[in-house]
């Protein structure tokens, strides 16, 4: 333009056209003034545009920084989501292990229930009281089994629900990761409002995921008694969420204020650009009018030049016309430039209008975010109330479970105590049973000795009967009355001894039958005592003391019996010695004693003594020997009385009859005491087995069974 103006000035200096020079100078002056004004305006617009460009660049940088901050927050939230997911998987694994443990306990309870059911079938033959107790126990176990089944079904449903929730959380995590990758890939090129909307949507999804995770935690902690810790963590997370939401609200309010300020500035800029556009339009109209006037002037000049007399100046006028056309072309190019600038300004105005609409949309979204925040606060309050109610229910269930666990631990402790006491008592019971078995063996040996004595008595009675028959055959007319009385006494004593022997055998058979019956009933009593041992633990020490007293009393009675038997044996020996001396005196004074009878008596005494001496291995055998010698002495005395009845007379017969009566009475008393002692032994053995041996589940019953079998064998 300056070159054009300089050319115009040079041309004005050298121009010869005097008529067009002032108009051209005026035109050039106006053009210079207009161009100066336009230059100043354009420079101001350029400065304003640069300032707005700088502001938009700063806003873009702040938006990028905010987007980076949101991306970092999204990464942190993704990490938190992964940590929560791993924690929930661990909790699910733990609860699955607990469910397996509960299933194992349920199987154990089922096995114990089956055992108790079998025991109940065995004990169905018992009384009504035991049946009622078993029914109550079975009903309690059935209720427990049904309760455990219901709990196992609930735990299985909860486990399936947790697995479904974990799968849903895994899908949500994958979708969030994909969205996060898309945001990272497209976050730089997107506008700021879209990034914020996507970020808000992701936050809402993350918040919903966190709410679902919190609900899962509440449900899981209700089962695992860890609600306190998770409640604290939930409260802390809610506080942090509220604080983060408050901070985000403050940041968004500040951004809204900044956007309002930028919108106001842009509105002012748009208004100023509109005013400038109107001024440019007016200026273009004015230039068009001047151009039309100049065209008219040029046409008039051409007409003047076409007239005659203007030929010399035609070349110069043509040159001036070319210059003017060049100027007009330059002005047209300048006008085109101005139009392009106007179009650019219009485009910028349109972009500013779009930006204003976007700002209004953002403001609307901000209002929606505020409404969503208020709704979230209400939802948080509702969730807090539900959490408090769930915590109250959890506390109640926890208290019930604590009571149940305390009851179970007390029962287990009581069971351990009973097991320890029973295991401690088994050794003492075993010792007592061994002592009882030894005592039974000793008494069986004594019974054998008594049987041997009875056999010897039978032999002696038979021998005496033979002697009496021979004496009667030799002297049928002597002392028929005395011999008849002696024979009757011996027959009666023999019958009594046979009757006693038969009674002993019957008692042995009855004892064997009772032992077999007790063997059959002891197993049932043992199984019933297993169920009743818990109620009888406090009576254990008293029963032990009572049994010890009974045993001590029996030992004292045995010792007294032994001392009494020893005293009687000594008394019998003294009487036997006196009788022997009397018989010797009678034999010396008797002239009718045959030698064959003495030899037979000696031979009859010698087998009795030999049979008695064969059993001299213990004190009982010694007693048998004494009784055998006593009976042989009685036989000698009777033979001596039978042979010397004529010489001695009635005093000797009265002594022998009195002695035989005393001996029969004492033998009957001894047998009765032996029978009573055997009965007391049987009662003691049965009571001991029913009280103690049936309480233990150990294989120590074999000791008693072996003892009873050996006792039966010895009796046989």
UniProtKB/Swiss-Prot annotation:
Alphabetically ordered keywords of this record: Cell cycle, Cell division, Coiled coil, Cytoplasm, Cytoskeleton, DNA damage, Mitosis
**What are the recorded Gene Ontology BP terms?**
cell division; centriole replication; de novo centriole assembly involved in multi-ciliated epithelial cell differentiation; DNA damage checkpoint signaling; signal transduction in response to DNA damage; spindle assembly
**What highest taxon heads this organism's lineage?**
Eukaryota
- Any coiled-coil regions, as ranges: 38-394, 426-590
Q: Where is the composition biased (Polar residues)?
A: 587-600
Q: Does the keyword Cell division apply?
A: yes
Q: Where is the composition biased (Low complexity)?
A: 601-622
Q: Name one GO cellular component term.
A: centrosome
Subcellular localization, as worded in the UniProt entry: Cytoplasm, Cytoskeleton, Microtubule organizing center, Centrosome, Centriole; Cytoplasm, Cytoskeleton, Microtubule organizing center, Centrosome
Quote any Pfam family the record assigns. Answer: CEP63
- Indicate the transmembrane segments per the record: none
Q: Which InterPro entries match?
A: Cep63/Deup1_N
Region of interest (Disordered), ranges: 587-626
Q: What does this protein do?
A: Required for normal spindle assembly. Plays a key role in mother-centriole-dependent centriole duplication. Plays a role in DNA damage response. Following DNA damage, such as double-strand breaks (DSBs), is removed from centrosomes; this leads to the inactivation of spindle assembly and delay in mitotic progression.
Similarity comment text for this entry:
Belongs to the CEP63 family.
Write the protein's name: Centrosomal protein of 63 kDa
**Gene source species:** Danio rerio
């Amino acid at each position: 333009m300056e070159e054009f103006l300089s050319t115009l000035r040079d041309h004005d200096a050298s121009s010869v056209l005097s008529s067009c020079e002032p108009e051209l100078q005026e035109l050039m002056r106006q053009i210079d003034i207009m161009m100066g004004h336009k230059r100043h305006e354009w420079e101001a617009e350029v400065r304003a545009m640069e300032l707005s460009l700088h502001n938009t660049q700063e806003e873009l940088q702040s938006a990028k920084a905010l987007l980076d901050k949101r991306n970092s927050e999204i990464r942190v939230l993704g990490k938190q989501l992964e940590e929560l997911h791993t924690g929930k998987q661990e909790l699910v694994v733990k609860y699955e292990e607990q469910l397996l443990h509960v299933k194992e306990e349920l199987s154990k309870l089922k096995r114990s229930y089956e055992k108790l059911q079998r025991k109940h079938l065995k004990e169905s033959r018992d009384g009504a009281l035991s049946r009622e107790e078993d029914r109550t126990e079975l009903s309690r176990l059935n209720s427990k089994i049904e309760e455990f089944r219901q709990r196992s079904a609930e735990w299985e449903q909860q486990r399936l629900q947790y697995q479904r929730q974990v799968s849903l959380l895994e899908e949500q995590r994958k979708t969030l990761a994909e969205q996060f990758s898309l945001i990272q890939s497209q976050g730089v090129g997107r506008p700021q409002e879209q990034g914020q909307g996507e970020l808000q949507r992701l936050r809402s999804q993350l918040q919903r995921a966190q709410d679902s995770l919190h609900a899962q935690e509440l449900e899981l902690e209700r089962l695992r008694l860890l609600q306190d810790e998770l409640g604290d963590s939930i409260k802390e997370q809610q506080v942090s969420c509220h604080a983060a939401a408050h901070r985000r609200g403050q940041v968004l309010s500040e951004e809204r204020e900044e956007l309002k300020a930028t919108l106001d500035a842009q509105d002012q800029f748009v208004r100023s650009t509109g005013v400038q556009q109107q001024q440019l339009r007016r200026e273009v109209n004015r230039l068009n009018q001047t151009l039309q006037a100049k065209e008219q002037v040029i046409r008039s000049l051409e007409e003047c030049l076409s007239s005659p007399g203007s030929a010399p100046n035609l070349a110069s006028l043509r040159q001036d016309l070319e210059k003017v056309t060049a100027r007009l072309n330059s002005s047209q190019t300048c006008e085109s430039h101005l139009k392009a600038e106007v179009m650019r300004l219009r485009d910028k105005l349109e972009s500013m209008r779009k930006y204003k609409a976007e700002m209004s949309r953002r403001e609307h979204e901000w209002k929606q975010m505020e409404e969503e925040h208020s709704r979230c606060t209400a939802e948080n309050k509702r969730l807090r109330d539900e959490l408090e109610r769930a915590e109250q229910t959890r506390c109640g269930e926890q208290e019930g479970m604590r009571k149940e666990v305390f009851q179970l631990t007390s029962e287990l402790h009581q069971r351990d105590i009973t097991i320890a006491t029973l295991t401690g008592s088994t050794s003492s019971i075993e010792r007592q049973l061994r002592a009882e078995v030894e005592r039974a063996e000793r008494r069986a040996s004594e019974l054998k000795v008594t049987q041997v004595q009875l056999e010897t008595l039978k032999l002696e009675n038979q021998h005496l009967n033979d002697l009496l028959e021979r004496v009667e055959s030799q002297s049928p007319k002597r002392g028929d009355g005395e011999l008849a009385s002696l024979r009757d006494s011996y027959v009666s004593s023999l019958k009594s001894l046979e009757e006693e022997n038969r009674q002993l055998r019957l008692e042995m058979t009855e004892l064997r039958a009772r032992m077999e019956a007790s063997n059959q009933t002891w197993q049932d009593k043992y199984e019933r005592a297993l169920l009743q041992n818990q109620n009888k633990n406090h009576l254990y020490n008293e029963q032990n003391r009572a049994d010890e007293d009974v045993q001590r009393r029996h030992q004292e009675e045995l010792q007294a019996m032994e001392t009494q038997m020893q005293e009687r044996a000594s008394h019998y020996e003294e009487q036997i010695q006196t009788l022997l001396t009397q018989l010797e005196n009678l034999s010396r004074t008797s002239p009718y004693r045959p030698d064959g009878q003495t030899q037979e008596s000696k031979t009859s005494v010698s087998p009795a003594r030999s049979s008695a001496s064969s059993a001299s291995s213990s004190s009982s055998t010694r007693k048998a020997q004494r009784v055998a010698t006593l009976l042989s002495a009685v036989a000698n005395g009777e033979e001596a009385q039978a042979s010397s009845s004529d010489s001695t007379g009635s005093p000797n017969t009265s002594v022998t009859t009195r002695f035989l009566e005393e001996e029969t009475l004492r033998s009957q008393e001894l047998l009765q005491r032996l029978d009573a002692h055997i009965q007391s032994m049987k009662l003691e053995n049965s009571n001991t087995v029913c009280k103690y041996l049936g309480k233990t589940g150990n294989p120590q019953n074999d000791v008693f069974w072996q003892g009873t079998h050996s006792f039966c064998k010895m009796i046989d």
